[in-house]
């Protein structure tokens, strides 16, 4: 965590409610759709700091700063689905209670990323005097989600706004890539990194939701959900809800069919072909499986790469193999021909097989 400007006690302002509380008619981040069809990512979003599934050290620190009336400007960064937005919204609910709507300005910087937003909406909101009506704190809050999508000019303009309105407003910036935030903004905020969630936390939260919804999920299905989420709670919930809509019983196979990812047994079969069969046989078999199961070559590459770590082979062969697989995945990201890259994949393993045979002798 990097240091911030000295956090001073929050000052109490008085006067009119802030303008621009809703951004151009957009629903705020915290609005939760009603009804049974509500996305589970919103239905089960933590409502208080105590409900946040992980990162207890960060949450406890922010909670303590809030209780001591010393909340600084915040910069929360890390991969998607790790609780950044939920944490800030929980802080805002704790601070403002029923006055939440009047005291916080929520903007998604990926949609509203220009300098005009800083000069108009944020400047107007921060400069307006607020009347707390008994809220615990009367300092206002500006929440900028996906702040790394803001233009550099907008970030420099925001720096000046933060300096000018520190006594009356706290700014909370949320982003995935902290290197896209200018140093001048970073130095004015206290930084917290939200790492991908541990599989244990994802599993426990999923168990709670499965029980609440009365779902039929076996152990294989739950393990598949945790594995495919890669520490992203939002992704895990979306996969769970999608699979539930497609299948009454949520099994490992149902989860993989819903997401289109290759199953572990498919990867084992593909690895067997790559390590044992001829070029033509491997090409035909993998192509047939891709067509039959609707698999994407890039997903196969990623899973095969992880499988390579489990195979016994000389270190130099493994290093070259992983490097070649990374090159193939890179080329696929530029929409290169799938058949050509499948051929490159098989050729890479053919070379690795030759190197392993030579090393054995």
UniProtKB/Swiss-Prot annotation:
Tissue-wise expression: Expressed in roots, leaves, shoot apical meristem (SAM), flag leaves and panicles.
UniProt GO BP: DNA repair; DNA-templated DNA replication; negative regulation of defense response
CDD domains reported in the protein's UniProt record: AAA, HLD_clamp_RFC
Superkingdom of origin: Eukaryota
Gene3D superfamilies: 1.10.8.60, 1.20.272.10, P-loop containing nucleotide triphosphate hydrolases
Subunit structure: Heterotetramer of subunits RFC2, RFC3, RFC4 and RFC5 that can form a complex with RFC1.
Name of this protein: Replication factor C subunit 3
Organism: Oryza sativa subsp. japonica (Rice)
Gene transcribed to yield this protein: RFC3
